[in-house]
Amino acid sequence: MKNFKTFLNESYSNWENDEPVSYAKHLEKTFGSPDEMTDSQLCWFNKDGFKRIVIKDEYILHGSPAPHYDFIYCYIDSRVPEKFAEPLAESSGSILIDYLKGEVGARCGSITANATTLNYVLDVVAERVSPTKMEYERRILEMKRMF
C-alpha cells in the first residue's frame, strides 16, 4: 500500500501546470500535508488565519495590476454588505464573495497577495477605505515591493 506522500507526488505528476505544483510543495513544507485532495486541487483548513487555502491545477492569466497567473484561493468568514459587491468586483476580479456561506475569498498567485486582497475587502467593509481599483492595485504593488 502506498503512503500518502507517494500518492500525493503521483497526483502532482498528472497536473498540467507546474507552478501550482511548486507552490503546493512549498505549502506542504509550511503547513504539512493537505487536508483534502482531488485529481486537480489540494485544500488546507484553518491555516495562517484562513478558513481554507485551495491550490488548483490551473494557471489563470490576470493582468491587474501587472500580468501574472492565479491558481491559489484563500477564504475567510466575512459578511460583505451587498452595497459593496459591485465596487469590489470593479476593484478586482480576484475577489470572490459567497453570500450564502458568509465568506469571501481571493484568487491570486500567492498567499501573501490573497491576504492583501482580503485585508482590502475587510477595510472596505469596515468603511476605512473607499473601494477603488486604484486603492486595490496600490496595495498589491506595495506588497510586491516588500518581497
Would you name each region that the model predicts?
Residues 1-10:
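Short acidic, low-complexity intrinsically disordered linear motifs used
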Residues 16-147:
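A cross-family detector of function-defining hotspots
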Residues 11-15:
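Short, aromatic-enriched amphipathic alpha-helices that serve as compact interaction elements
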